[in-house]
Amino acid sequence: MARSRRIKRASVTDIYRGCKQAGTCPPDVINKVEQTTIADKILKYGSSGVFFGGLGISTGRGTGGATGYFPLGEGPGVRVGGAPTIVRPGVIPELIGPADVIPIDTVTPIDPAAPSIVTITDSSAVDLLPTELETIAEIHPVPTDNLDIDTPVVSGGRDSSAVLEVADPSPPVRTRVSRTQYHNPSFQVITESTPLSGESAMADHVLVFEGFGGQNIGGSRNAAIDTAQESFEMQSWPSRYSFELEEGTPPRTSTPVQRAVESLSSLRRALYNRRLTEQVAVTDPLFLSRPSRLVQFQFDNPAFEEEVTQLFERDIEAVEEPPDRQFLDVVRLGRPTYSETPQGYLRVSRLGRRASIRTRSGAQVGAQVHFYRDVSTIDSDALEMQLLGEHSGDTTIVQGPVESSFVDINIDEPGPLNVGIQESPLADTIEEDFNSADLLLEDAVDDFSGSQLVFGNPRRSTTSVTVPRFETPRDTGFYIHDTQGYTVAYPESRDTTEIILPHPDTPTVVIKFAEAGGRFLFTP
């Protein structure tokens, strides 16, 4: 049976040519020929934003093209500071030769009619006729490495010497200097100084003047002397080249954070697990220095430091009472550990184990106990704040019978009052003219004008009474403040009434208290 011959089907291009004019082309043929398929659209739209040229994709090499591959987040570095490469064109120099080839040493024939005596002349001298012109050609070839330097040959007229002009074998090379600047955002140069108070120039010179202003509080009678005696603390002005390093908060522990967290978590699991560990708060201060004295009665060894784990041997069959009931049946007491409570206190902890039960095989069974004690806080000293100035309006009334000292003497006998008087002829006169009424007289006159008296309970509302200013013919006393300091005065305006008394011996102010406690008489 003869096999039928396979007929080649028409290609997509042939079908498109025949059916395009008639308009009977299938959609898949049109999309494939006109490149309007979904894959073609993705490539068209994606190629406008992404360029994959030169990467060597689908080449089988895997080298990344001409530039190679770089890790993510990095890129090719830029070489800064390299010497620029000067590009020089390879120009072939043009050779210029002489116009005529003439021997340098020319022999002139002798005329038969010339005399037989030959005059000897200097042949090295150059004799150029005035009518002849000398042609000199200078050639400066382009400096190359593999080119030879040709020496031009210059010829003159007849009966003249040749002049050779040799060019400089190393002519000056033309160079070009270029400058490239790269911006580094992590480095910044300050090219100007910061304008500061007291600075008169942009350089590091500071001029400090005085008398530009300010306010003086208080003062003294001689301001020139006080100004000369005052000492001012000098402060250095920062320069434009100076800087300060701000240090952060120093760490509270020397252990790294990761190790500290791991150790703290394991410590909390061992100490604060209430299902496996019994929590006991110790109040005895011996727990900090000698915890073994709380477990059993023993002698103190000053050479032994109780900073390690301690083991206590005891017979369970024998009943022994410990010094502290909380440390009953303790056979092991661990080394101290220090931690911080949520309230900020320092806690000293020791992990112990009790041996409450003993089996027939000799095994001891007991619970783990967490003994801890919180160190109390150290309160700061309460210091009384002192006032830095004298404030007006603060008045203190001192009651003499309460805060005074009494001396029991007989004023009718002047003997005890003459203590310290030297014996002299005037001593008898003093005893004779002595009068007990003179002891009650006082030359100083107190002035209470402008003062305030406050009545009432300090917890309740108080009443303030302003004492008026009086003008009487009495003696006036002056108080001079002889100490230096700051006086703070609050401006107040008071409406006082001036009263002129006709009789100066009459008391000025009489104040009566309606409350229980008696009556008091104040005389200025």
UniProtKB/Swiss-Prot annotation:
Q: Which family does it belong to?
A: Belongs to the papillomaviridae L2 protein family.
| Keywords associated with the record | Capsid protein, Cytoplasmic inwards viral transport, Disulfide bond, DNA-binding, Host endosome, Host Golgi apparatus, Host nucleus, Host-virus interaction, Late protein, Microtubular inwards viral transport, Phosphoprotein, Viral penetration into host nucleus, Virion, Virus entry into host cell
Q: Which GO terms describe its molecular function?
A: DNA binding; structural molecule activity
Give its localization.
Virion; Host nucleus; Host early endosome; Host Golgi apparatus
What is said about its interaction partners and assembly? Interacts with major capsid protein L1. Interacts with E2; this interaction inhibits E2 transcriptional activity but not the DNA replication function E2. Interacts with host GADD45GIP1. Interacts with host HSPA8; this interaction is required for L2 nuclear translocation. Interacts with host importins KPNB2 and KPNB3. Forms a complex with importin alpha2-beta1 heterodimers via interaction with the importin alpha2 adapter. Interacts with host DYNLT1; this interaction is essential for virus intracellular transport during entry.
What does this protein do, in the record's words? Minor protein of the capsid that localizes along the inner surface of the virion, within the central cavities beneath the L1 pentamers. Plays a role in capsid stabilization through interaction with the major capsid protein L1. Once the virion enters the host cell, L2 escorts the genomic DNA into the nucleus by promoting escape from the endosomal compartments and traffic through the host Golgi network.
GO cellular component, alphabetical, reads: host cell; host cell endosome; host cell Golgi apparatus; host cell nucleus; viral capsid
Coarse class of the primary localization is virion
Q: Which Pfam families match?
A: Late_protein_L2
Motif Nuclear localization signal in this chain: where?
1-10
Post-translational modifications reported in the UniProt record = Highly phosphorylated.
Source organism, top-level taxon: Viruses
Species of origin reads Human papillomavirus 17
Q: Write down what this protein is called.
A: Minor capsid protein L2
The disulfide bonds in this chain are 19-25
One Gene Ontology term of the biological-process aspect is:
viral penetration into host nucleus
